[in-house]
A protein has these predicted regions:
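Juxtamembrane and boundary regions of transmembrane helices in multi-pass small-molecule transporters
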Residues: 2-42, 122, 133-136, 173-176, ...
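Helical membrane-embedded segments and adjacent short helical loop/helix-boundary regions
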Residues: 20-31, 49-55, 67-76, 102, ...
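Generic alpha-helical transmembrane segments of integral inner-membrane proteins
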Residues: 29-37, 59-63, 81, 85, ...
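Membrane-embedded alpha-helical segments and adjacent helix-loop junctions characteristic
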Residues: 43, 74, 78-194, 352-353, ...
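Flexible hinge motifs at transmembrane-helix junctions and intramembrane kinks/re-entrant loops
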Residues: 44-49, 60-78, 262-269, 291-297, ...
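Alpha-helical membrane-protein architecture signal
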Residues: 56, 106, 158, 162, ...
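Transmembrane alpha-helix interface/packing and boundary motifs in multi-pass membrane proteins
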Residues: 63-71, 162-172, 208-219, 311-313
Length: 371
């Protein structure tokens, strides 16, 4: 059974902060300049003052993200603070003679943290940690990779298939890549492949690209899908079930993955076509995993049960996706039948990504409400 260690996290926390680059400083200054210019422009008659200011905040955020001027979690706090101030001192749409107020503006921007999509992202982080703690993700990968052969193209295909399997159980691309990346690095090292080689780049880049398309195919694979489902329910009065989504999106996703499979190999040409002795190494890696542990079995049962509830939602029962996911996470921590405790999970969760998702969803909500 593999375990997740917080040693790296501790070392990173203890290490001195790296200096900022000139490009980052320019990006930060540019973001504020663009924000200021937009705020100084006259407000169009068809746009509210709040909507005008939020366009400025959106431009500010995009520049921060494009230039990596600050980390994503830090950008989330900046977006939240700017929204609370700029929107708070804007006229209240319901009573134009009064200001909206910073408290009301803050409630709007942090509403993203209570959205079903946000909860799904947070839950995905816990599922990812559970996968890595028990080693179930590595077992799945080894079962697939030891069956596809030793050609680089086959190993690449195995990585893509592993990503597909994880997409059914881990509802976030970020969390899935957190599972896949260490596995791919382990495969590269155990098979004697150079980390800086094109083969290693192909496996890593290809896994991420394919995962993007699996996001589209499976409703619970990404938070933005639930945002879209919620929008269709409120704006179009249309409900889309998990199965309906899969049926509609699968053809497109599969075609795009096939295109990406061949295109990435053409753009990142491997140095060699087959790994000599790779079958022996893969068999050895699979054997090292050993028999399935009790925690792996528990996680597998919970994951299959969760997938079944997702797939039958709206058909056999009326429990929403977010509630079923929270139930599964609760089972992870339940005494005796659980697979981890909070002390283990807390340092291994990517809280920064959760903060970023919450602020991003909140920003989208505010943009919709400030017309």
């Amino acid at each position: 059974m593999s375990t997740v260690s917080s040693t790296n996290t501790t070392q990173q926390a203890a290490a001195p902060p790296k200096g900022r680059t000139t490009a980052q400083n320019i990006g930060l200054i540019l973001a504020f300049i663009v924000l200021g210019v937009i705020l100084l422009l006259p407000t169009p008659e068809t746009l509210s003052t709040g909507g005008h200011r939020m366009i400025g905040v959106l431009a500010f955020a995009i520049i921060l993200w494009m230039t990596s001027a600050v980390s994503y979690p830090v950008s989330a706090t900046m977006i939240t603070a700017l929204t609370a101030l700029l929107l708070g001192f804007s006229p209240n749409p319901e009573a134009p003679a009064k200001m909206l107020g910073t408290a009301n503006a803050l409630m709007l921007i942090i509403s993203g943290f209570s959205s079903p999509a946000m909860i799904l992202v947070g839950a995905a982080m816990f599922i990812s940690v559970a996968m890595r703690k028990t080693g179930l993700d590595r077992r799945i990968a080894m079962l697939v990779l030891s069956s596809v052969g030793t050609k680089v193209s086959r190993i690449y295909l195995g990585v893509i298939i592993t990503g597909l399997i994880l997409a059914f159980f881990v509802p976030s691309a970020t969390a899935r890549i957190a599972c896949l990346a260490p596995i791919i690095i382990g495969i590269v090292e155990n098979l004697g492949i150079e980390r800086k080689s094109r083969v290693a780049a192909l496996l890593m880049v290809g896994a991420v690209q394919a995962d993007t398309f699996w996001n589209i195919m499976i409703q619970t694979a990404a938070a933005q899908n639930l945002v879209a489902v919620g929008f269709m329910q409120t704006q179009m009065n249309t409900s889309v079930s998990w199965i309906d989504w899969l049926t509609a999106a699968a053809p497109f996703s599969i075609i795009m993955v096939i295109i990406a499979y061949f295109l990435t190999q053409a753009l990142i040409k491997p140095e060699f076509k087959e790994l000599v002795g790779g079958d022996v190494q893969l068999a050895k890696m699979r054997k090292e995993i050993g028999p399935m542990s009790t925690d792996e079995k528990k996680l597998l049962c919970i994951s299959i049960g969760l997938l079944a509830l997702w797939a039958t939602g709206g058909k056999l029962h009326s429990i929403d996706t977010t509630t079923t996911t929270i139930i599964a996470i609760a089972l992870f921590f339940f005494p005796k039948i659980g697979i981890m405790d909070w002390k283990f999970a807390q340092p291994n969760i990517d809280w920064g990504s959760i903060v970023m998702f919450g602020a991003g969803i909140g920003l989208g909500t505010v943009l919709l409400k400030t017309k």
